[in-house]
Amino acid sequence: MLTPLQNAAQITQTVAVFPATSFCVEMGANTGDPIGVIDDLALDDVYQLASGQRPKELRLTARADGQLLIAGNSDTGSAGAHLHLDCLITLMPDVGANVDGIVMVEVDNAGMIAAVYLLPLAPLEPQLGYTLVRKTRDGARRRLAQLACVSFTRGTQITLANGTLRPIEELQVGDRVLTRDDGAQRVRWIGQTTTRAIGDLAPVLIRAGVHGNERDLLLSPDHRLLVHNRRDLHRLGRADHLVRARDLVNGGDVTVQSGGFVDYFQLLFDRHHIIFAEGIAAESLLLDPLTRAALPDDHMAHSPGLLMGHQRVASGLDIRPVAAERSAQASQLPSQLRRALMR
């Protein structure tokens, strides 16, 4: 049976943001001003990303009541400061598809604005004009939560309790799915979102045969897979490792699939489980203060105790804090480790 991961690191979410001063109005009512809070924004203003600007990693965590905080080891912001999601905006570029973004506000101890950040939900190009065509206070928290949700893509075959396979889009609430450690478990909720497959929203493709899978597996980049290797690489007494899909990318048989749109599906159970997708052991949705906003409000109202049962599974050593964050390239595991894990 799965147990909560002992001494687990605080659950965090990492997003790539630009300081407000990197994204300023080049033409319009607020010419020269940086992106700001919703009351200061004027529709039809044209913004531009300054040349040479690169996004910074902002690490977030959340209290039980949902209040967002800036976590330690963040590239920007003050650790422990409150973070407010001010609004959701839509930008229309001079060339290409619209880009949504979330305006985030860091608040100091006096309740005053300490900093403003823009979290673009698709890459921004420097020296390109972006016209502000929409601003709203609604939906920002849900969009942020969707970024944190681990997701499978349309067509992914999920193993049911009786051993048969079913495409994820054909699953229904109440269906019994096979879990690695707790037998058959009923699906409590199924989420579905369609998004542009670009940047951090682009899925990772694991080719057939890489991990004993007969078919390709396409899933969200932060989705953790349970990978077994004969050697205990960290001498911690475990040969099973939970590894993010993005950390297995090697440019060959595990790649990022950018371009077009992708249909993402999330599976929620009473607890966090390891299930089987295309035969590969992978985690289900972990419901925590960062991801629960992705669920409909009425679902949480009817299941008030659901969040209490969700803690990270301890089926294997979680590579993310142990190895990935010690690597010189935290976004990707060393090639030697990737090769060993895939044996």
Regions found by a protein language model. Name each.
Residues L2, Q6, I11-L60, L68-A79, ...:
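Sequence-level preference for short, compositionally simple segments enriched
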Residues I70-G77, L160-P167, G252:
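Short alpha-helix capping/helix-loop boundary micro-motifs
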Residues L83, F152, L165-Q172, V177, ...:
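Short, well-ordered loop/turn sites that connect or cap secondary structure elements
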Residues C87-P93, V177-T179, I206-R207:
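Short conserved beta-strand and strand-loop elements enriched in small hydrophobics
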Residues I89, I158, L171-L178, L225:
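Generic structural signal for buried aliphatic residues
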Residues N98-I102, I168, D181-G191, A197:
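Short, Lys/Arg- and Gly-enriched loop/turn segments at beta-strand edges
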Residues Q146, T153-A161, I190-L295:
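Long beta-strand-rich cores associated with HINT superfamily self-processing modules
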